[in-house]
């Protein structure tokens, strides 16, 4: 198995078939809905809040609300009241089961539920998927996070409708340093490896540092790409604004950091400051245009045409072997 990450790969262009990149369709389908981009902001406290999630849903983007200090049932009611789809995160502890019971008792069904724990290839996740499928069968269940084909096969067999792939490749994640495990440094290979066995959508989570990495993720099997640091640090971002030497920054920290947990126990995340980079809508527009360009370079008109291109692995003597021609 070849090992590579985003920096080691370049996609090879094919003959362009469009007059303008604006003809290229960046939309993607997930759980019976079509979204404008194959991109979803990370379900982290410094990336999304109720206001951002509402705006994303109203403007045709996918979102996943975080699960920290939040009344999930009220959140779903609020989203439905505004005519929006509801997409929430759950853990695997007793309060999460209680939340599911409240949904059932009140006859409420979130359209998307993401079971979101650091090591998602676990019996605890199997049990939660089984419970959700029995209690709220209409919900589209995303489960993760995982980093191996065995995990993807198991999660799909347990009933997950999509899997989230990525263990520790994120900018504020220190899992590989703290534990010695993960996909940090080879996330793109791990995605390719997992996608080979997947029969349902994969959400690639973590390691995205530029818009081109989104196209690379789609090429190697992602339906949707979860992005944290590129979405943190906007004017609307919920992170605290910090001034350093006259420059404005937003706080961005990992979900398993002591900043998020409020205690120093089982810490696998850190805090950084992201320079404030304008409005979220502008970044999403730029992302859309860049992905349209990627599609035009792929010789196609639709997002999944990116999957047909060849690629080279940089930095190895054997780069030529990987041309698929």
From Swiss-Prot:
One of its GO terms (molecular function) is GMP reductase activity. GO terms for biological process: purine nucleotide metabolic process. It is an enzyme of class 1 (oxidoreductase). The active site is at residue 173. InterPro entries: Aldolase_TIM, GMP_reductase, GuaC_type_2, IMP_DH/GMP_Rdtase_CS, IMP_DH_GMPRt. Catalyzes the irreversible NADPH-dependent deamination of GMP to IMP. It functions in the conversion of nucleobase, nucleoside and nucleotide derivatives of G to A nucleotides, and in maintaining the intracellular balance of A and G nucleotides. This is GMP reductase. The lineage of its organism: Bacteria, Pseudomonadati, Pseudomonadota, Betaproteobacteria, Burkholderiales. The gene is guaC.
């Amino acid at each position: 198995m070849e090992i590579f990450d985003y920096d080691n790969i370049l996609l090879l262009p094919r003959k362009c078939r469009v007059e303008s990149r604006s003809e290229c369709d960046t939309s993607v389908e997930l759980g019976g809905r079509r979204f404008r981009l194959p991109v979803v902001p990370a379900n982290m406290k410094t990336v999304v809040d109720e206001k951002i999630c509402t705006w994303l849903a109203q403007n045709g983007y996918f979102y996943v609300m975080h699960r920290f200090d939040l009344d999930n049932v009220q959140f779903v009611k609020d989203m439905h009241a505004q005519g929006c789809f509801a997409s929430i995160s759950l853990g695997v502890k007793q309060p999460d089961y209680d939340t599911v019971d409240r949904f059932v008792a009140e006859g409420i069904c979130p359209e998307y539920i993401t079971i979101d724990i650091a090591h998602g290839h676990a019996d605890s996740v199997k049990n939660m998927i089984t419970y959700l499928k029995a209690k709220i069968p209409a919900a589209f269940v995303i489960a993760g996070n995982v980093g191996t084909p065995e995990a993807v096969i198991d999660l799909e067999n347990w009933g997950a409708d999509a899997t989230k792939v990525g263990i520790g490749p994120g900018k504020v994640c220190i899992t590989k340093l703290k534990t010695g495990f993960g996909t940090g440094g080879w996330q793109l290979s791990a995605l390719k490896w997992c996608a080979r066995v997947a029969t349902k959508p994969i959400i690639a989570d973590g390691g995205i540092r530029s818009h081109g990495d989104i196209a690379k993720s789609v090429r190697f099997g992602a339906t949707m790409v979860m992005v944290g640091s590129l979405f943190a640090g906007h004017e609307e971002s919920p992170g605290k604004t910090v001034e350093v030497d006259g420059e404005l920054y937003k706080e961005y920290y990992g979900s398993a950091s002591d900043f998020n947990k409020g205690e120093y126990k089982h810490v696998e995340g850190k805090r950084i400051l992201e320079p404030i980079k304008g409005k979220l809508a502008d970044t999403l527009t730029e992302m859309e245009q860049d992905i349209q360009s990627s599609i035009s370079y792929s010789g196609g008109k639709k997002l999944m045409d990116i999957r047909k291109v060849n690629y080279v692995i940089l930095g190895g003597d054997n780069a030529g072997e990987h041309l698929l021609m």
